């Protein structure tokens, strides 16, 4: 039987569950799929039980092994892809590698415990990697008799969110019980539906990749006699059309401007190339030696070359093929951005002597050449072509 056609009529949003171990992330994921299957039956809304979500398959993303469960469901207005990372380490890796790009997340906090160390760490990571919209689900409220205690826990969560620059006073907090909803208690099922209504309204529809400013990482460059220089690569975001003015950014100190005189895909002329397309772009007024792999073609003014930034990184374990030993301040590996390696030095946070394989840490990086980067750009850390870490730019410094 043919697979059902993917329905594009509803907007698609990526979300996930985050929070401390055993606070009920996976139970909530199961409850959402199950309650939606009961209340809004459709071919997409199929109940998933705890065990099937918990037994997440291993995936490899940029050389790192991650367990992640992917489930899909739909509300009346939207289609969702939802990720749930079972272990804390999986969650950290997911965020840092960009394997799971979330438009928003549901922060699950057990009312019986209140915020715990991983609650804090996941909030910080969300801030660092650019997950801007969090909704709080206070779970296990059926186990707390004291109304004042629930109020205290809610205040504590809101304060913690404000501490990390989320709108702690204003963001939605829903109190419920994932387990009770899963078991079919209609009062708690109603709360799951309320949670989904909140997700529908509070997490904005993401901007589509084609609506963003053009970014095309250059993979290859060649010249066509009599026509000029062609740069090829996969369009990361945005669109490119004939007669567009573009900038060539990175590696070199100056930004070069040019005009697109042709766009080709599979040797055919196109009117425009879209995000995801592998294209060749013919550039007027650009010599073969004025553009190289590792640069990007971008909409003018949309991205700048930088050498200094803060990054949130995960360092691979020996078992993942990473280093066997720690590294120290001023470690100088290569940073692989999109299509090229650039050497850079690492400065560790004050008070951090060294970084062990398996750690995640915030670092300051200084590259020897400028690269087109912005907050949210992902990179790998490599040593002689071998990946030893993975990171994401959290702040531009120079």
UniProtKB/Swiss-Prot annotation:
GTP binds at residues 19-26, 84-88, 139-142. InterPro entries: EF-Tu_GTP-bd, EF-Tu_GTPase, EFTu-like_2, EFTU_2, G_TR_CS, P-loop_NTPase, Small_GTP-bd, T_Tr_GTP-bd_dom. Keywords: Cytoplasm, Elongation factor, GTP-binding, Hydrolase, Magnesium, Metal-binding, Nucleotide-binding, Protein biosynthesis. It comes from the Bacteria. It catalyses: GTP + H2O = GDP + phosphate + H(+). GO terms for molecular function: GTP binding; GTPase activity; translation elongation factor activity. Mg(2+) binds at residue 26. Its EC number is 3.6.5.3. Residues 177-179 are annotated as: G5. It holds the Pfam family GTP_EFTU_D2. GO terms for cellular component: cytosol. NCBIfam families: EF-Tu, PRK00049.1, PRK12735.1, PRK12736.1, small_GTP. PANTHER family: ELONGATION FACTOR TU, MITOCHONDRIAL (PTHR43721:SF22), ELONGATION FACTOR TU-RELATED (PTHR43721). Belongs to the TRAFAC class translation factor GTPase superfamily. Classic translation factor GTPase family. EF-Tu/EF-1A subfamily. Monomer. This is Elongation factor Tu. The lineage of its organism: Bacteria, Bacillati, Bacillota, Bacilli, Lactobacillales. The gene is tuf.
